[in-house]
């Protein structure tokens, strides 16, 4: 991927360029704005703008003092923006990684299914990866994003979809190609090299 694109797009924020596909989202450092967002949705996810692998992602279903302390810490006492999104119950069925290679969605995806009692499907956080065929909705979202990726010389990306919602666009080091190959014998990396 073009290094300029890696500098231009924050992976957590990039998805907001496609508001028609994302869950309700707030990017803010203001405790009052985060509180109002929570009051509107009653169950939210909060995460830093620079995290990976499921680290520092919290589900907030009560604005008790413990959760407010976490928010204060994550926002560095309201100096650092974080991303807040309405919680998507479909996450328990899988956080799907869809690879977009040379402007085309790969036909197999990886459903990262959270371990019991957790909501994080990230493999690094203990989730289990299950390869599946891409759905029509996933393909539609990927095809809408692909032209922007191509225009910015991003030839290998991994988008994350939970239920019907786009949650992230990963362009730095998208994972899950190995798991897809191991389970389906279809090789995303081979597909990537065909386009070079």
Regions found by a protein language model. Name each.
Residues 1-27, 33:
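Conserved N-proximal alpha/beta basic substrate-recognition cap immediately N-terminal to
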Residues 133-196:
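ATP-dependent carboxylate activation and anion-phosphoryl transfer catalytic cores
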Residues 1, 27, 45-47, 83, ...:
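A structural signal for short, well-ordered beta-strand segments and their strand-loop junctions
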Residues 25-28, 150-152:
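Short gly/ser/thr-rich secondary-structure transition/capping motifs
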Residues 9-12, 57, 169:
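Short, charged, surface-exposed secondary-structure boundary motifs
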Residues 31-32, 39-45, 49-139, 149:
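Phosphate-binding site of ATP-dependent enzymes
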Residues 3-7, 112-114, 162-165:
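Short glycine-enriched loops at secondary-structure junctions
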